Amino acid sequence: MAAPNSLFVRACKRQPVERTPVWFMRQAGRYMSEYRAVREKYSLVEICKKPDVAAEVTITAAEALNVDAAIIFADLLLPLEVMGLPFHFSPGEGPVIEVPIRDAAHITRLRTDRAHDLGYVAEAVKKVSDHFGSKLPVIGFCGAPFTLASYMIEGGGSRNYLEVKKLMYNSPHAWDELLGKLVAVLSEYTADQVKAGADVIQIFDSWVGCLSVEDYRRYVLPRTTELVKALQHSTRVPIIYFGTDSATLLPSMRETGAEVIGLDWRVPLDQGWSLLEHSVAIQGNLDPVLLFAEWPELKSRAERILKQADGRPGHIFNLGHGILPHTPVQNVKDLAKFVHEYSSQLVGPRE
């Protein structure tokens, strides 16, 4: 942990800050010409597995945007490979699991003893941490147990999560075994990132919004809480837990014990924070598509979010999901600058 007193880390802990910190999910991506140039040489997975290149991509984006944190360049699905579930990226389709899980026997065969084989991610974290030192914190991350399990079972993206829910409802013991194995791998994987210099860990639960509150509490909350507690025990860095389409789940997500809850754009920030009883920090929550809007509209929406935060310690400005391809880079830069300037004028030091 190289930047424990940074604006971003202090906000994660709901400590007073001089202005609202800002960073963006998928801030290194195809919308940037520098990233596209790297992708002409390497595939996404090749970048992830080359620490020098992953670090370069991470650093370039953070410096170009002048944000308050650098999130390591990696992919959510990397842990699947070391568990014995190969995947590849299909043009136009995204990730494809070559042999999806369909039964308990397949779950039993999954390995949990190879998390250290993902050490190339930790090596990239170290390079980024060494580069920035105390100037800029580094965010490590992993996918949440539910979202990764969904990929493993569906074999890729899904509209109705039929196979996931069939296994969850019909084979609850096998389902819990799968999530337990994921927790074992993910806790080691993220702990290695922290040892390498990550100041914060974000857990991405991108698909959790497909669940009812009842199903989330019964089938997902216990193992997700286990992951958060394991990380807090072994690393003592703040944990951000982010899900999409999750407004109805927010009170339950708070029970994981994560220090920060990420909001998507579907719930107003002030309402989302109220649902969380203002007991945690929050991150969000601009609609990524607004980055395509003309500046007056984009500025107005960002201003609204900052006003909804109402000067409370613990707000980190971000999008409600990742930056989209073809997003105008200048809009992202202008937004980061505006958040810095407007939030410092709006609230000053927060007590």
From Swiss-Prot:
It is found in: Cytoplasm. The keyword Lyase applies. InterPro entries: UROD/MetE-like_sf, Uroporphyrinogen_deCO2ase_HemE, Uroporphyrinogen_deCOase. The gene is hemE. Its EC number is 4.1.1.37. This is Uroporphyrinogen decarboxylase. Catalyzes the decarboxylation of four acetate groups of uroporphyrinogen-III to yield coproporphyrinogen-III. It comes from the Bacteria. GO terms for biological process: protoporphyrinogen IX biosynthetic process. Homodimer.
